[in-house]
Structures are given as C-alpha cells and as structure tokens.
C-alpha cells in the first residue's frame, strides 16, 4: 500500500485499497471515435481498376455521398469529362453527376483523358492532378493548346504554390481534397453558368436600352460606351443573367474575379462601386445594383426611363 507522509501528518483518512507500487488508479478508456470516410484518394480502399475509357458500374447505393439540395444546372444535360485514377472516388463521382443529369465520360489516366477530350466536346473537365503516366498538369497544358473548355483541378496537394501552378497552366478552378459534395456542386455550377453566358449570342443579351458588347467587353447606352473593365463587364453580365436573384459574394468572386472569397477582401465591393458610377455617367437609371445584407448583390430592373 502506498501512503503519502503528508496525508498521515494531517490526519487524513487513508484508503485501504492495495495497489501495486508501480501503478495508480486506472482511468476509464475513452471509446474510440468511428472513422469517417473523406473524399481523398489516399483513404479509399482500392478496387479493381476499370478498363480504359469504360464507364465504371454505378454502385447500387452511394456509400460516400449523402443527399443535398443542388442548385439549378444552367446547361441541359451538361457533358462532363471526369479523369480520376482512384476507382472508388471515380465511381461515386460518376454516379453522383449522372443522378444530377450530367452525361459523364470517365477515364482512369491522363493519356485516355486526352484521347477522350480530342474525340468529343465537353462542357466541363474534372481533372485529378496525380495521375499515372500523363499527369493532370501535363494533360491540362495539352488541352489548352486546342480548346478553352473549363477545367477544375482536384488534388490533395493544397499548398499555395500548387494552386498557383494549376492556375498558371490554364485551370479555371482548383478544388483541394478532401472536399465536400456541396462545395463541388457549387463550383461546377458556377463554371457551367459562365459557359452558358459565354455561349449566348450578342442578340440575346440586348437590352431595350442597354447593349452588351462581348468583343469590346463593354456596354452601350444610347450609343455611349460605359468604359467598363473586363471584370466590371463580367460582373454586370452575371448580375443581368440572374436579374432579381441575390447572388452571394463567394459565387461572384468565383464567377467574376476567378478567385476565392475571404471576409477581408473588398475587391468585389470596389468593382460594384465603380460599376454604379460608370452606369450613372451614361445615364443608365433602369438598372440598380442593390446590396443584400448578409448575402451579396442583386440587379433590379425598374420602370425608370
């Protein structure tokens, strides 16, 4: 039995439980936390790899993704090229996008991804960086020599230099692993909205009083150019495309400024201020850019002449 001398001196009662001199009272062991699957290629158990350019079978039950509310897809049945070497992640992404109405072509390596991109026109490419053989960055460079299809990179390499390397080689977005399904959907929908906007002919963008000139990246009101910058033009075109709808700052940063939103970044607010001023100079009074507290901005069309 272990007895503390100070306890005896103070007359404290002594416990009678005998313990080995080498151990103290045993603390109850906490129950182990259940392991959670994350959308990262390194933690998925590998299955047999699919054949080249063959669609992986869609699992009967999606074990990774849960049901979420999706935003509206701006392009009917968009065509998606998915290049991912992890069979488990590839299958689940394939199943998820097919349920959303996408037409998906899946590839397990860069060489077959490049071959598929040369055979068919896609609305969006979802591309892993760490691929066997031809890696994702090399594939991206090859795609950019031939086409301007939006490309979103996926990678566990989330360092700043890795992201910069992806953007400088032509990526439109960069999604670090692990990622949430909600963020994946938000980013893909934002890219598809840009695709739809870019494909609209000039005639469909005409306002009875305001004309959008895609080539000059400017608007004209009563024959007078507003003198917009490319970012201001994209901002006004995006707001006009979603007139009456409050667009969040994260969405506008991705769609217009092509970067992620941070709370201390006031770049979008500056562009909105300049855009309001330039529209006022050319007497555009029927369009108002309103701030929505806690959300972002929306464009309101009034009956003002």
Curated annotation (Swiss-Prot):
Q: Where is the Response regulatory domain?
A: 79-192
Entry keyword annotation includes Membrane:
no
Q: What is its main location?
A: cytoplasm
Q: What does its PTM field state? A: Phosphorylated by PfeS.
Q: Where in the cell is it found?
A: Cytoplasm
Matching entries from Pfam families are given as:
Response_reg, Trans_reg_C
Biological process terms in GO annotation: phosphorelay signal transduction system; regulation of DNA-templated transcription
- First and last residue of the signal peptide: none
Query: What is a GO molecular function of this protein?
Result: transcription cis-regulatory region binding
Q: Which keywords accompany this UniProt record? A: Cytoplasm, DNA-binding, Phosphoprotein, Transcription, Transcription regulation, Two-component regulatory system
Q: Write out the transmembrane intervals.
A: none
- In the record, 4-aspartylphosphate modifications are located at 128
GO CC terms, sorted: cytosol; protein-DNA complex
Q: Can you tell which superkingdom this protein's organism belongs to? A: Bacteria
DNA-binding region located at which positions? 200-301
The role this protein plays is:
Member of the two-component regulatory system PfeR/PfeS. Activates expression of the ferric enterobactin receptor.
UniProt name for this protein = Transcriptional activator protein PfeR
The organism of origin for this protein:
Pseudomonas aeruginosa (strain ATCC 15692 / DSM 22644 / CIP 104116 / JCM 14847 / LMG 12228 / 1C / PRS 101 / PAO1)
The gene is pfeR
